[in-house]
């Protein structure tokens, strides 16, 4: 179908040459480059690009994984990981204030066995996890240790293939 081909070509034009980051050499920039490399961002960028062109909205969730390491060139208790959240598998609930600033973000998913529904909500202050199983919902609230919503949200008004629909 034309829609799929339009998305493939647009993604190829946007991501065929990997993004190049530049900054003055520093330990922080080196660590940043290692995070990008270890998370295989070239592949993720392509997936994000494709999904936003298909669905008009996709999110990238960043989270720490506890693991004593020196992978980024400095001693750390954590590895930074990310996950692409597409409407194909997740329900996304961004919430904005009157100035279009993201003030909270929710993501809902169902386990592969369809036995649990998990809704996670992120604010600058806290991370909420609501788990529903067999009609019973449990709630867990943890402080958001980074003080920011750990999500990069990508949106566009219409899918890239909109003009061939009509």
Segment roles from a protein language model:
Residues 1-79:
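Extended, helix-rich architectural segments
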Residues 52-57, 61-166:
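Structured, contiguous alpha/beta core segments that scaffold functional sites
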């Amino acid at each position: 179908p034309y829609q799929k081909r339009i998305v493939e070509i647009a993604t190829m034009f946007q991501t065929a040459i990997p993004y190049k980051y530049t900054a003055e050499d520093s330990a922080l920039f080196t660590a940043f480059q290692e995070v990008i490399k270890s998370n295989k961002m070239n592949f993720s960028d392509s997936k994000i690009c494709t999904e936003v062109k298909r669905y008009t909205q996709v999110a990238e969730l960043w989270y720490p994984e506890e693991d004593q390491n020196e992978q980024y060139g400095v001693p750390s208790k954590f590895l930074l990981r990310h996950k692409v959240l597409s409407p194909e598998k997740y329900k996304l609930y961004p919430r904005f204030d009157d100035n279009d600033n993201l003030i909270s973000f929710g993501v809902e998913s169902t386990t592969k066995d369809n036995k649990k529904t998990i809704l996670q909500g992120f604010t600058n202050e806290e991370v909420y996890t609501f788990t529903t199983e067999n009609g019973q919902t449990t709630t867990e609230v943890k402080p958001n240790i980074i003080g920011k919503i750990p999500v990069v949200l990508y949106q566009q008004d219409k899918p890239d293939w909109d003009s061939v629909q009509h």
